[in-house]
């Protein structure tokens, strides 16, 4: 298996993923759990991907240091369930040039609706709560074929996945990077 699999072991993320899998809390509480989980998982997924620049601004009286995200970089978070849009709303305030894209599984061919030009600075994050290999395969194939996206520009994030799903993906995509909180042995 040639996949780059990162098992997210941060205690807060593990706790939130467990709560979202097993809780029967109110809608408002679950919504808050999903928001927090989404923010933390996206953080873990892109922290090594994001490039920053340190700028020093000198005036006659003082010197300020600013840290900015590379302005050439842009991101698209692709997800398959409208209920998960709340997971990513807060990230839009933190990460510049972020697009959210809902692709419903009913229309597997709507990956052609992406409206971005393929460039090496564009990064695509596919998010599934529970990994769906059919959806992921169709989406990645469409991105590669229709938009000339390179596999290194794509990362996959899910709360849980099965070993057989990872094996299926490894047979198709060398070096796909996957972040997950739980791998279920099947």
At which residue positions do the language-model features occur?
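PRPP-associated nucleotide enzymes
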Residues: 1-186
């Amino acid at each position: 298996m040639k996949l780059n699999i990162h098992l997210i072991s941060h205690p807060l993320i593990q706790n939130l993923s467990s709560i979202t899998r097993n809780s029967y809390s109110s809608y408002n509480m679950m919504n808050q759990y999903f928001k927090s989980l989404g923010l933390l998982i996206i953080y873990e997924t892109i922290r090594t991907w994001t490039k920053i620049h340190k700028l020093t601004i000198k005036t006659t009286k003082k010197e300020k240091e600013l840290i900015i995200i590379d302005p050439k970089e842009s991101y698209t978070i692709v997800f398959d369930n409208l209920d998960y849009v709340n997971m990513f709303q807060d990230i839009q305030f933190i990460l510049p040039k972020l697009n959210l894209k809902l692709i419903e599984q009913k229309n597997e061919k709507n990956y052609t609706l992406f409206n971005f030009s393929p460039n090496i600075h564009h990064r695509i994050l596919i998010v599934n709560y529970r990994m769906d290999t059919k959806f992921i395969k169709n989406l990645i194939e469409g991105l590669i074929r229709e938009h000339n996206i390179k596999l290194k520009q794509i990362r996959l994030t899910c709360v849980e996945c099965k070993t057989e799903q990872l094996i299926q993906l490894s047979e198709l995509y060398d070096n796909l990077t996957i972040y997950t909180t739980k791998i279920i042995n099947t």
